[in-house]
Structures are given as structure tokens and as C-alpha cells.
Amino acid sequence: NIVNEAKTDLDIMWGHHIAFGLPFLENGAQIECNAKKIISEQAMPDSRRFKPGVETDWPSAINLNDQKENASIIPAESEFPYSELSYLSGFGEKGNYSIIDSDRNLGFHLSWDANIFKYLWYWQERYSTQDAPWWGNTYAIALEPWTSRWTPDPKQAINNGEWLSIPKDGTISTKLSASAIIP
């Protein structure tokens, strides 16, 4: 539950930072997801995987060489470093994903209310960012349900109705369901 105890309406971004790393992703992994669309964030470093601002049908994405690439495949740790943030959307009523390491026959599954969490942030930091806060020493993939996409202009996003609005004295109830995938 999220409760607005204020005497005024409140507009928020709300998300859950669910991240994965080593050794789970050492050999790469596969994402299975019911998203329909993917678009990559404009405001990311140059050392990235996908072309920014181009919306495609999930799991296809356009890479920096203007080639189609399967975005559901997470490359092995030994492959090229990059930093990326993409947004998956178009889930219908319920969003869900599984991330699976087929070499270890192990995975993780998550489902959520896609009427509230309309986006899945697909964040990847693979030893690319050489300054704060990662210092070239972070390998993480996060699949994060969020109510909206990131914005440098919160006021504009609120005016456009992009953020979740909680009425004064209001409550929003939801749940996420997580499970391990073990044979």
C-alpha cells in the first residue's frame, strides 16, 4: 500500500529496483516478457547497446549499427561493456517477466499490476561507467516495474498526466509476485 497522508493530491514516480548480477549472469541470460514495445532512453552514455529514442516491437531493438538485435538476450559477462536504460511497455492488465540462466537451469519470475506499473525499466550497467557511482566496477542488470519513464522535467510529466496521482488522504493498493525458477 502507498498512502498519501497529505491534504493535497500527490503526483509520484513509484518503482521497484530488482537487480541481478554475478555469478547468476556470468554466462548471459534470456528474458521472457509479455511486453509489446521497447524504447531506449535518450540520456545515457555513448557506450550503450541500443539506439536511443527508437521504439520497436519487443524483443527486437535497433543497435548502434542500425541492425536489429534481440534485446531479450543478455550477453555473457565477457562480452563488450556498455551502459543502457530501456523501457518496456504494452503489457495489458498484468505485466510479467522471467530471467533465465539456461546454463544453470535457474531463473526468477515476477508479475505485477500493469495498470499501476506501466513500464519495466531494463537497466544494464556492464563495467562501462568509469566515474561515480560505478567506477568501472559494476555488473548489474535490473528489471524494474515503474509507474512511468524517467524524465528530466518532472513538472512537465505531471502536467502531461504521466505520473501516478494519489488523491489527498488516498491509498493505492497493489502487489508484486516473485518466484524462483528451479527445475
Question: What spans do the regions from the language model cover?
Answer:
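Asparagine-centered strand-capping/turn motif at beta-strand->loop junctions
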Residues: 1-6, 134, 180
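Acidic (Asp/Glu-rich), glycine- and aromatic
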Residues: 3-32, 122-124
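Short structured motifs
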Residues: 17, 158-163
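Active-site/ligand-binding surface loops and adjacent short beta/alpha elements
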Residues: 22, 26-114
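Short Pro-Gly-centered flexible turn/kink motifs
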Residues: 46, 164-182
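Glycine-rich active-site loops that engage anionic ligands at enzyme catalytic sites
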Residues: 100-148
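Beta-strand-rich interaction surfaces with strong enrichment in secreted/lumenal proteins
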Residues: 131, 161-166
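Short, structured beta-strand/loop micro-motifs enriched in basic residues and often containing a Trp
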Residues: 150-159
